């Protein structure tokens, strides 16, 4: 059996042709494909506006800036996430506050969000972990009660959805139905890729305008915003923005990939079903569950085992199966320790981390490869 990575992109000939066409065009960046990609993604997710950026971290950063996060502000996010979900708060001078997770899902726990609220809380960044949405109805209720901004971190969860508790209506992640903004990531291991890339979705035109400013140096050429004008060449800088632009080359790939996203997600669900069926019969293995009324887009497949370190090391040393851990609790990192964060903040997150292994999950994974992964994991757990 060849090497099986824990995740990889699925690039086909039509993707390559789309990128080649972009390379032959007169616009490699700041051209029409950026606008097309933004409009296509906004329509797909059910949002009014989309702002494409260079990566998911940039999306989080400008979302925090647009939300008004600044020195002294606290922002609550999950302890189990990639560091960027908290780093974006630090970039703005704010303080990340870590909420614990729900056992069984690794999703941010609304009950612990309530416990972490203070007079300084400005926003909540709920993380849709492994493809499954957090409890946005409850989190939205908390935000409304306390006049807080919500920025959904949906880096894992494009195309995911959840059902409203008192109706049969399904809400798409990215529609911003329960939030002010939603961020997406298009990294190579995500459900849809532009190599590197990200996006902020919103239904608020004022936020949209701020996001556009922050993406591109805070500069505008629109007479709508100018204090003065000296002609069509003239531009003004109104905010301390950044160069977070996504190129037309990358957007060409994103447009092509978006046409196949439903196919990609369907295959991920098939693989998850094979894993669920196999591991539900093994007492020594637990795994992240999909909650009733939630439709995961299956970015990751996480098993939970005792003796995680030994099993992980055996899989690395004795098989050709790529495995990973998602994630180290953010406040465990040395940088956060230097800021004064200590272990013990989020007991459920720490328990989860001690047991979690991410196993291969990507749409090109063949059935015989899935079966091989299952056999090897059964073997090491039994031993």
Enumerate the language-model features and the residues they cover:
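N-terminal "arm"/small-domain region of PLP-dependent enzymes with the aminotransferase-like
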Residues: 1-27, 32, 236-238, 360
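Glycine-/small-residue-rich active-site loops that bind phosphorylated ligands and cofactors
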Residues: 11, 29, 81, 104-105, ...
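Phosphate-binding glycine-rich loop
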Residues: 27-74, 88-92, 98-100, 165
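PLP-dependent aminotransferase class I/II
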Residues: 35-40, 47-50, 111, 123-127, ...
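Structural detector of well-ordered beta-strand residues that form the stable sheet scaffold
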Residues: 51, 76, 97, 150-151, ...
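PLP-dependent aminotransferase-like
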Residues: 65-165
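Conserved active-site segment immediately N-terminal to the catalytic lysine
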Residues: 152-193, 209, 233-237
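Short beta-strand-to-turn element immediately C-terminal to the catalytic PLP-Schiff-base lysine
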Residues: 184-185, 198-203, 255
